[in-house]
Amino acid sequence: MVQRLVYRSRHSYATKSNQHRIVKTPGGKLTYQTTNKRASGPKCPVTGKRIQGIPHLRPAEYKRSRLARNERTVNRAYGGVLSGVAVRERIVRAFLVEEQKIVKKVLKLQKAKEKTAPKS
């Protein structure tokens, strides 16, 4: 006769957060063992891609006590938050904006010089 199995917790619905495995104990009984969800790892909010160099863990596992700082981040600006492509894009955009400001300033000075030159 097949042994009947009962969930060990009160949560009785077959949801994603309540997944179980059937395991045989050393005493020969079958029991349910809760399985952990697979970790997808951190994603870049800009590109949506996985961030390279950071392990795929559940959110609680990234806490200070469980993971060293060098395993939680990547050694660059926005390391561990944005992907390398997104950071490069931001740096280039910031540079181009600054260049545009300088060009605008130079053009304004040239215009002012032209206005003052013909008068004298």
Curated annotation (Swiss-Prot):
Keywords in UniProt for this one?
Ribonucleoprotein, Ribosomal protein
- Segments carrying the region annotation (Disordered) are 31-50
| GO CC annotation | cytosol; cytosolic large ribosomal subunit; cytosolic ribosome
Report the GO molecular function annotations: mRNA binding; structural constituent of ribosome
Q: Show the PROSITE patterns listed in the entry.
A: RIBOSOMAL_L34E
**Gene3D superfamilies documented for this protein:** 6.20.340.10, 6.20.370.70
Q: Its Gene Ontology biological processes?
A: translation
Pfam families tied to this protein = Ribosomal_L34e
Regarding protein family, the annotation reads:
Belongs to the eukaryotic ribosomal protein eL34 family.
Q: Which PANTHER family match?
A: 60S RIBOSOMAL PROTEIN L34 (PTHR10759)
Q: What is this protein called?
A: Large ribosomal subunit protein eL34x
Q: What is the lineage of its organism?
A: Eukaryota, Viridiplantae, Streptophyta, Embryophyta, Tracheophyta
GN (gene name): RPL34C
